[in-house]
């Protein structure tokens, strides 16, 4: 038995196919979703979506949003998403280093909040590059 997973951003469909299982980062922690999961709606945190397909794990960086699960259908609506395999490792590492520097030099509450969010997004992209084996 499988689940139908759709990952959507405001600009595109990132994923729309059947999967065996997912692990989703929510605001209250990670949750695993298998076929016949109880219906839920949850906020999606900045983090990694792990997808099991054909007994292999794939990763996707999600940048926060909302998910609805029910009747073996999972719809994830997020601000942005990138498949781990599509992320350039060198560019992601440079972005992470820049984000870390920006956190250190941020002044004022707003700058600190924005710098910390950018750092979380950069860390998530770097983490998505290395899928689970």
Curated annotation (Swiss-Prot):
Gene Ontology cellular-component annotations: chloroplast thylakoid membrane; proton-transporting ATP synthase complex
Per its record, what are the GO molecular function terms?
ATP binding; proton-transporting ATP synthase activity, rotational mechanism
**Lineage: superkingdom:** Eukaryota
UniProt xrefs under InterPro entries: ATP_synth_F1_dsu/esu, ATP_synth_F1_dsu/esu_N, ATP_synth_F1_esu_C, ATPsynth_dsu/esu_N
Where in or outside the cell it occurs: the entry states: Plastid, Chloroplast thylakoid membrane
The name of this protein is: ATP synthase epsilon chain, chloroplastic
Describe the task this protein carries out.
Produces ATP from ADP in the presence of a proton gradient across the membrane.
Kindly state the subunit structure of this protein: F-type ATPases have 2 components, CF(1) - the catalytic core - and CF(0) - the membrane proton channel. CF(1) has five subunits: alpha(3), beta(3), gamma(1), delta(1), epsilon(1). CF(0) has three main subunits: a, b and c.
UniProt KW keywords: ATP synthesis, CF(1), Chloroplast, Hydrogen ion transport, Ion transport, Membrane, Plastid, Thylakoid, Transport
Q: What family, per the record?
A: Belongs to the ATPase epsilon chain family.
Question: Membrane topology type, per the record?
Answer: Peripheral membrane protein
CDD domains documented for this protein: F1-ATPase_delta
Q: Which organism is it from?
A: Nicotiana tabacum
Q: Show the Pfam families listed in the entry.
A: ATP-synt_DE, ATP-synt_DE_N
């Amino acid at each position: 038995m499988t689940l139908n997973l759709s990952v959507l951003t405001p600009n595109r469909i990132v994923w729309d196919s059947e999967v065996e299982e997912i692990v989703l980062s929510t605001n209250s922690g990670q949750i695993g979703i298998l076929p016949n999961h109880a219906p839920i709606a949850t906020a999606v945190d900045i983090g990694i979506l792990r997808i099991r397909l054909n007994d292999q794990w794939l990763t996707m960086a999600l940048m926060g949003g909302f998910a609805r699960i029910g009747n073996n259908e999972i719809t994830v609506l997020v601000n942005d998403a990138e498949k781990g395999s599509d992320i350039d490792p060198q560019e992601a590492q440079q972005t992470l280093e820049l984000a870390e520097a920006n956190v250190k030099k941020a002044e004022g509450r707003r700058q600190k909040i924005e710098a910390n969010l950018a750092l979380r997004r950069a860390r998530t992209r770097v983490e998505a590059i290395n899928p689970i084996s």
